[in-house]
Curated annotation (Swiss-Prot):
Subunit structure comment from the entry: Part of the 30S ribosomal subunit. Interacts with proteins S7 and S18. Binds to IF-3.
Organism annotation: Anaplasma marginale (strain St. Maries)
GO annotations of cellular component type: ribonucleoprotein complex; ribosome
Family stated for the protein in its record: Belongs to the universal ribosomal protein uS11 family.
Protein purpose: Located on the platform of the 30S subunit, it bridges several disparate RNA helices of the 16S rRNA. Forms part of the Shine-Dalgarno cleft in the 70S ribosome.
Database matches in InterPro entries: Ribosomal_uS11, Ribosomal_uS11_bac-type, Ribosomal_uS11_sf
NCBIfam families: PRK05309.1, uS11_bact
Protein known as: Small ribosomal subunit protein uS11
Keywords: Ribonucleoprotein, Ribosomal protein, RNA-binding, rRNA-binding
GO molecular function annotations of the record: rRNA binding; structural constituent of ribosome
One of the protein's GO biological processes: translation
Length: 124
């Protein structure tokens, strides 16, 4: 888990959760966008296909939130989630159970409006 060394008292922040099919990446920043903590399921000792599970997302978010609450005293967050992964709902629930006041939940998953042509299907 990457933690910024400078200790500041940050009461309000943002939790960015990127849930892919293979991993979950969590970044916690203050309102100006300065990163306080970033971690992933792989950094929390989940390897292989276990990184894509909802439990891995829950544990990853819980570790990141615990670190930022202890170091910076964060109390209020807004959650921004993106990606199609399996751990989306579990990650949001983990933020809500960590004694943080959640002001908003935004979904910023990018969806194509019939954009680029997909690669041709593999024949075995």
């Amino acid at each position: 888990m990457a933690v910024v060394k400078k200790r500041r008292n940050v009461v309000v922040g943002e939790v960015h959760i990127y849930a892919t099919y293979n991993n979950v990446i969590v970044t916690i920043a203050d309102q100006q966008g300065h990163v306080l903590v970033t971690t992933s399921a792989g950094a929390c000792n989940f390897k292989g296909s276990k990184k894509a599970t909802p439990y891995a997302a829950q544990e990853t978010v819980a570790r990141a939130v615990k670190a930022v609450v202890e170091r910076n005293g964060m109390r209020t967050v807004s959650v921004c989630i993106s990606g199609p992964g399996a751990g989306r709902e579990a990650a949001i629930r983990a933020v809500q159970t960590c004694n943080l006041n959640v002001t908003s939940i935004r979904d910023t998953t990018k969806l194509p409006h019939n954009g680029c042509k997909l690669p041709k299907r593999r024949r075995v």
